């Protein structure tokens, strides 16, 4: 198992990044790939979790140990796989997530892609009261560089890759387009806030 990788960030796609470590490119699924844009072609440290299945060996990456700890707790819940856990983390309001779990706010939890009422209830049952301030609260995302409409397009692609439907995204795209000068990460955060209302 790997704890983290140190290497050069060489590629960003809607669901993954590629880190070159000693000439080997590691494909790593992350919650918000475009949050890494400012670090393109630089040395980065990414915390990872490896999932081994019969048909695939996958790496999931995190900006810090707290985000990884949250991911591990989420995938421990029956009904939440790695992709759903990444989609939940991508919302970037981890304190709100923890509050929703502790307060049994099923309506809030079911707004995440791949989380139905049954899974939300299981999250509450398995995770309520198990979060502490050092392990999961206050997870910060990477700072991303400035961008224009390309950033909005990247954000929409990333949200679709996380499981949000095109019809949902169309409803908020006009509002997002009015917010100029945001990074992909900021567009994603705004989109998630709009969809959570």
Swiss-Prot record:
The gene is ruvA. The RuvA-RuvB-RuvC complex processes Holliday junction (HJ) DNA during genetic recombination and DNA repair, while the RuvA-RuvB complex plays an important role in the rescue of blocked DNA replication forks via replication fork reversal (RFR). RuvA specifically binds to HJ cruciform DNA, conferring on it an open structure. The RuvB hexamer acts as an ATP-dependent pump, pulling dsDNA into and through the RuvAB complex. HJ branch migration allows RuvC to scan DNA until it finds its consensus sequence, where it cleaves and resolves the cruciform DNA. Gene3D superfamilies: 5' to 3' exonuclease, C-terminal subdomain, DNA helicase RuvA subunit, C-terminal domain, Nucleic acid-binding proteins. Residues 64-142 are annotated as: Domain II. One of its GO terms (biological process) is DNA repair. Pfam families: HHH_5, RuvA_C, RuvA_N. GO terms for molecular function: ATP binding; four-way junction DNA binding; four-way junction helicase activity. SUPFAM superfamilies: DNA helicase RuvA subunit, C-terminal domain, Nucleic acid-binding proteins, RuvA domain 2-like. The keyword Plastid does not apply. The keyword Cytoplasm applies. It comes from Lactococcus lactis subsp. lactis (strain IL1403) (Streptococcus lactis). It comes from the Bacteria. This is Holliday junction branch migration complex subunit RuvA. Residues 1-63 are annotated as: Domain I. Residues 147-197 are annotated as: Domain III. Belongs to the RuvA family. Its main location: cytoplasm. CDD domains: UBA_RuvA_C (cd14332). Keywords: Cytoplasm, DNA damage, DNA recombination, DNA repair, DNA-binding. Transmembrane segments: none annotated. Has three domains with a flexible linker between the domains II and III and assumes an 'L' shape. Domain III is highly mobile and contacts RuvB. Residues 142-146 are annotated as: Flexible linker. One of its GO terms (cellular component) is Holliday junction resolvase complex.
């Amino acid at each position: 198992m790997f704890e983290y990788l140190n290497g050069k960030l060489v590629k960003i796609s809607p669901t993954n990044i590629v880190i070159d470590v000693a000439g080997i490119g590691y494909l790593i699924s992350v919650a918000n790939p475009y949050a890494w844009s400012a670090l393109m072609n630089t040395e980065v440290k990414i915390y990872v979790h490896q999932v081994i299945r019969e048909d695939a060996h996958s790496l999931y990456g995190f900006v810090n140990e707290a985000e990884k700890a949250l991911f591990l707790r989420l995938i421990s819940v029956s009904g939440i796989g790695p992709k759903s856990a990444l989609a939940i983390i991508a919302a970037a309001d981890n304190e709100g997530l923890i509050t929703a779990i502790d307060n049994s706010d099923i309506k809030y939890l079911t707004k995440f892609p791949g989380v139905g009422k049954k899974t939300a209830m299981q999250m509450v049952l398995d995770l309520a009261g198990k979060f502490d301030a050092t392990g999961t609260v206050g997870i910060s995302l990477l700072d991303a560089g400035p961008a224009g409409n390309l950033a909005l397009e990247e954000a929409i692609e990333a949200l679709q890759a996380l499981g949000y439907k095109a019809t949902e995204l169309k409803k908020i795209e006009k509002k997002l387009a009015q917010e100029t000068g945001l990074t992909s990460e900021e567009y994603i955060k705004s989109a998630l806030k709009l969809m959570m209302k």
